[in-house]
Amino acid sequence: MSDMAINSVVVIHGPNLNLLGEREPKHYGTSTLDEINTKIQAEALQSNISVETFQSNSEADILNKIHSIKADFIIINPAAFTHTSVSIRDALAATKIPFIEVHLSNVFARESFRKESFFSDIAVGVISGFGAEGYLAALRYAAQKK
């Protein structure tokens, strides 16, 4: 990653993350997406970073969002698209904006198909298994580049 200052971050939440708080709490915890976004905003405020959060169940909407990003850094939880979306991978690579891949659950302790990511090899880093704290850790990493 270059030494450029990070002033703005976009957080992208992939499919089904709008169901957090009710969907498989054993894997994803009990926090809702709104609660996670509130924590992200609070962390960004402390770090004096502008942050935008975005969630979609649509691959096309996520692609369009990535294409339009003017931020310095991306934090993405591609969710189920982790294992299927070459197009999102290509969009992230094309933007040349550094990003961290985040997963709420430990994908390596789950089904074998979840262990393959189309994003990890081009990401600055991957955070998996720390619940909502993973987003905050990624934001702290971006903030230290300020």
Feature-to-residue mapping (PLM):
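Mid-chain, well-packed structural core segment of small domains
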Residues: 74-108
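Short beta->alpha linker loops
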Residues: 57-58, 80, 130
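Mobile beta-alpha loop/short-helix "lid" or hinge segments that flank ligand
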Residues: 10-16, 104-118
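Nucleotide and nucleotide-moiety/phosphate-recognizing core
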Residues: 40-68, 89, 95, 100
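Short acidic/histidine-rich motifs immediately flanking catalytic phosphotransfer sites
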Residues: 68-74
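Short, glycine-/small-residue-rich phosphate/pyrophosphate-handling segment
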Residues: 109-146
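Glycine- and acidic-residue-enriched helix-capping/strand-helix junction motifs
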Residues: 20-34
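Extreme N-terminal starter segment of soluble prokaryotic enzymes
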Residues: 5-9
